[in-house]
Every structure is written in structure tokens, then in C-alpha cells.
């Protein structure tokens, strides 16, 4: 089974969402009469202000697979609380054999992240972050692990509500 890694393609549509294609894989189904070829596309969509979604699409042709993936990513968007263009706090994410460490960074640091993680932060609008991946480097698992970590973010307001205190008490 051949595998094609497509370059990360970016594109901004009229609705203001940023789209990036992370990978396109050629997949094969073996049946009695031979092989059936198809394509699987992995994409992320974001608004540049903390909203992010991931989609995976499969089809017989590449453009259809990418379109399906983009539509699924738009449907699966969720909001991540950002703080001045970076994350709220350090967080770990995991999916399958992939694990990621996401940490906030000072202004001017930039996005220090590899491959699929960089695409996620670019469409999300994060300007300063340090990210490290451990384990499997499968693009699908890395994106899912990154999104898992981002979902675990807590704002000072969330923490204050859990503890029954005010935000000023939490921040010191």
C-alpha cells in the first residue's frame, strides 16, 4: 500500500476560516476481483481566534476526499481559551501511541512545533507556543493528541469556579 504525504496547504475562504490539509494517503481495499484504490485526507480548520476543528475524509478521488474532510472539520469545531496569543498553561495530550506536551511561550518565541501540530496552531491563531511530540508520529494521532491537550485547557475563571473562589484569589 503506497502512502503519499501531501504538503500542508493553506487556504482562507470567504467565511474567514483558515483551512490546512495535513496529509493525503492513498489507501487500497483488496477484494476478490483485485484492488480498489481510494484516498484519505486529513485537514484542520480554524478561525485564527481559538476555534479549531479536525476532519478526515475518504473518497475515490483526492479533491472529493479533501472536501469531505474540510466539511467534517467545520462541523467539529470547538473553542480553546487563549491568553495573549498563547496557551493558558502547560498541558499534556494523548491519543493512541502519540503523546504531546504543549506549553505557553513568551512573545517573540513563535510556534515551535513539528509537522501536524504546527498546522493546528497556525489555523487556531496561536503565535507563541512550544510543543513536543513523543511516541508515534502518525499525523492523525498527533492531531488528535494535540486537540486532546487543547481541550484540557482551563481558564482562571474555570479554576476559580471549581474551588469556589474569585479569579483574583486564584491569580494572586
From Swiss-Prot:
The answer on whether this UniProt entry bears the keyword Transferase reads no
- PROSITE patterns found in the cross-reference section: RIBOSOMAL_S5, S5_DSRBD
Q: Which residues form a coiled coil?
A: none
GO BP terms: namely: translation
Q: Which InterPro entries match?
A: Ribosomal_Su5_D2-typ_SF, Ribosomal_uS5, Ribosomal_uS5_bac-type, Ribosomal_uS5_C, Ribosomal_uS5_N, Ribosomal_uS5_N_CS, Ribsml_uS5_D2-typ_fold_subgr
Give the multimer and partner information: Part of the 30S ribosomal subunit. Contacts proteins S4 and S8.
**Name of the protein described by the UniProt record:** Small ribosomal subunit protein uS5
Q: Which species is this record about? A: Paraburkholderia xenovorans (strain LB400)
The gene it comes from is rpsE
Amino acid at each position: 500500500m503506497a502512502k503519499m504525504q501531501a504538503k500542508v496547504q493553506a487556504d482562507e475562504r470567504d467565511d474567514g476560516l483558515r483551512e490546512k490539509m495535513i496529509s493525503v494517503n492513498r489507501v487500497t481495499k483488496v477484494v476478490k476481483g483485485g484492488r480498489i484504490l481510494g484516498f484519505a485526507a486529513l485537514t484542520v480548520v480554524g478561525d485564527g481566534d481559538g476555534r479549531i476543528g479536525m476532519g478526515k475524509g475518504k473518497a475515490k478521488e483526492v479533491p472529493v476526499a479533501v472536501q469531505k474532510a474540510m466539511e467534517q472539520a467545520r462541523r467539529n469545531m470547538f473553542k480553546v481559551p487563549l491568553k495573549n496569543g498563547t496557551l493558558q498553561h502547560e498541558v499534556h495530550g494523548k491519543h493512541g501511541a502519540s503523546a504531546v506536551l504543549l506549553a505557553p511561550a513568551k512573545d517573540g518565541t513563535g510556534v515551535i512545533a513539528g509537522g501536524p501540530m504546527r498546522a493546528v496552531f497556525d489555523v487556531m491563531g496561536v503565535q507563541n507556543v512550544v510543543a513536543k511530540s513523543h511516541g508515534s508520529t502518525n499525523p492523525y494521532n498527533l492531531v488528535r493528541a494535540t486537540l486532546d491537550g487543547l481541550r484540557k485547557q482551563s481558564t482562571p475563571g474555570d479554576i476559580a469556579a471549581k474551588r469556589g473562589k474569585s479569579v483574583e484569589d486564584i491569580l494572586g
